[in-house]
Amino acid sequence: IRVQSYKPSNSAKALAEHLQIPRLSTSSSRFIGRPSDIIVNWGNVNAVHNSHYLNPLQAVKNAANKVTTFKQLQEASIPVPTVHYSKSTLEADKTYFARTNLFGHSGDGIEVGIPTELPEAQLYTEFIKKKHEYRAIVVDDEVVDLKKKLKKRDFEGDRSPYVWNVANGYIFARNDIEFPPTLPQLAIDATKALNLSYGAVDIIQDRNGNLYVLEINTAFGLEGTTTQLVGEAIKKLINKRI
């Protein structure tokens, strides 16, 4: 049993330490995998060894591509923001996110504006004025951690109304928070739709209480309590596959 990430990763390191198993190098390794070996896959899309990968390589590849992600979620009737694959179909008076990098994360490759302000791109999603944003971590069809994005109190920069991330002064919190009752099942259904064994599902809620899935991360951040919760859940998953 090994952990392998798509690039050097503190989260993969933390997971390997919790599981007390070795990590595989992202570039070179003397490890020769066998079909009976299990590799805990942390965002890797390329088969390096002839082994059993958790998560499946193709599922991780699909989750990494924003177009493929939205198409699979739509096919499974998972609620997502209105999606366009051509600039010509956008409505002139609406605000959209243009995804210039289909494999970006943490706001990378996102441009916001009305159609005349946006570049040509392979994917556009309609802006939804969100009231809340959540992250639900799913492992083996169970939600093992729920968090909500909150404004960091001592942040002194300008907050973006569009992208809520650390750079814009937002942090995750889980204590003393009331979560929408349908949130866990939505996260599970979204993970199943992409055939993932585990993932961090980012979900927003609009002012009317509607929930929308934005993406599913397969190499998400791990620290503190999250490492413990995810690590124990993946340990159980490994034991089921041995």
What residues fall within each predicted segment?
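Short secondary-structure junctions
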Residues: 76-79, 193-197
